[in-house]
Each structure stands twice: as C-alpha cells, then as structure tokens.
A protein has these predicted regions:
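C-terminal transmembrane-bundle signature of multipass membrane proteins
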Residues: 154-229
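C-terminal TM-helix exit segments that contain a strictly Trp-centered aromatic cap at the helix terminus
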Residues: 76-88, 152-165
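Hydrophobic cores of alpha-helical transmembrane segments in multi-pass inner/ER membrane proteins
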Residues: 14, 43-58, 110-125, 188-204
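Membrane-proximal helix-loop-helix units in multi-pass membrane proteins
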Residues: 82-138
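Alpha-helical transmembrane segments
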Residues: 6-21, 69, 149-152
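Short aromatic-rich membrane-water interface segments that cap or initiate transmembrane helices
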Residues: 34-42, 97-112, 176-188
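Membrane-helix boundary/juxtamembrane motif in polytopic membrane proteins
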Residues: 130-152
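Juxtamembrane "helix-exit" motif on the non-cytosolic side of transmembrane helices
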Residues: 22-32, 90, 127-129, 161-174
Length: 231
C-alpha cells in the first residue's frame, strides 16, 4: 500500500513540475507563479484535494470519530486556495470586519459559525495530534518529519506574504519586479507545504491509525490497545 502511494506522490511531483515549467514557458514566470488562479495556485489546490481524498480513503471506520479533523483540514486548505474567506459576503465570510460592518445579522451568524468550525478543527488537530506526532518524531518516522517541514514552510510563507507592504511601513519601497519575486517565493512555499502534507499521507501506515478507548478481544481475553500506536 505505502509503496503504491509513494509512486502516486512521485507521479504528482513530476506532474506539478511539468505544469509549472510549461506554464512558465508559455506565460512567463510572473504570471505562472504570482497570478491569481495561475498554475501554481491550481496545482496547490489539486495537491490539497488529493491529500484529502487519500486520507479519507485510508482512514478506517473506527478512526473517523476521533480523527475527522485530518481530512477536514485538507478541505479547509482547498477552500482557502479558492479564496472562500473573501467570498459570499462583504467584506468576506471569514473576515472579522464583518462583525462591525452594516450587514444583516444572519450573515454575521453564518460567519461566526464558520469561524467557530475552523477553530474547533484546528484545536482538535493540535490537542489530539501533538502526542502521536511528538512520539513519531522521536522515533524518526518520515511522515512526522514531513509534517514538521510542511508547517515550517507554511509559517515562512505567512512571513513572506506582503513583504512589500511590511517594508513600506518602515519606509522601504520595493520595485515591482522584486515585489513579484516575493510573491513567487510565497506561492512556492505554500506549494511545498501542500506537497509535504501529501508526502506524509503517502508514507503513513494505514494500519497505524490510533484506536482511542477501544478494547480488542484476543483469544477470549480483552486487551487494552495503546491509544496512540505509531506505525
């Protein structure tokens, strides 16, 4: 199973690289790497979507109740790539300014529910996943290190995002070309984040999903399974 998924990951990497190279040759690097709806954004969306599908496919029935936030987070990443946070309402479904804007109360309620759902997903990912992730890192599991590398890339992309605006605040103005370079770097980091998560999914052992609070019956005796076994 893992060997097949590693082949899938290698195929995805080759396909992504091919799309970016062809798009750069046809449209120029600035459009391919920085334009809204450009090649790099679309490939990132496809990678997140594939990661979510593979997680849902691999997750056994007993794990869904506790670990549903994992496929859910991939869905949220896809929605972010589609700019859903700025859609539907003015100033945007997930913009906090909506609570002080003159919009119908039901729109504020929908936004509050959406933000609450996202916050719940993130909290559950952290509180339920930090233990297994930490133990997997200690044991040198590749999927755990892939997740950490991806998170580092995501943090770096946030820091790079809007570098021109941040520098302008202290009196430094970047030429247009340099501004596009920073945008391209941000997009590449986000794509690296998506690929790192996909790699983690592809090298994760399907049999290693933690059983939380489940008793396994073996030879007529009830044996308490570890809550967080690491594959």
């Amino acid at each position: 199973m893992r060997r097949d998924l590693r082949t899938v990951f290698a195929t995805v990497v080759v396909a992504v690289a091919g799309v970016l190279v062809v798009s750069t040759l046809l449209q120029g690097w600035d459009r391919a790497l920085t334009a809204e709806g450009g090649a790099i954004e679309l490939t990132g969306l496809a990678v997140f979507a594939l990661g979510g599908v593979l997680v849902a496919w691999q997750m056994p029935a007993h794990a869904w109740r506790r670990w549903w936030p994992i496929p859910a987070i991939f869905v949220l990443f896809c929605l972010r790539e589609l700019d859903v946070h700025d859609a539907f309402f003015t100033p945007g479904l997930l913009q906090t300014r909506i609570f002080t804007s003159p919009v119908p109360i039901w729109q504020k309620a929908v936004s509050a529910l959406a933000m609450g759902g996202i916050l719940l997903t993130l909290v559950l990912i952290v509180t339920r996943g930090i233990g297994p992730l930490g133990r997997a890192l200690w044991q040198g599991r590749g999927w755990a290190w892939s997740v950490v590398i991806g998170v580092v890339m995501a943090i770096a992309s946030v820091l790079v995002d809007g570098a021109d605006r941040q520098l302008a605040a202290i009196g430094v103005t970047l030429p247009g070309a340099e501004s596009r370079v920073w945008t391209a770097i941000e997009e590449l980091l986000e794509l690296g984040f998506a690929l790192s998560l996909l790699l983690a999914v592809c090298i994760w052992d399907r049999t290693g999903w933690p059983r939380h609070g489940v008793n396994a019956t073996r030879s007529g005796n009830k044996v308490r399974e570890p809550q967080h076994p690491i594959p």
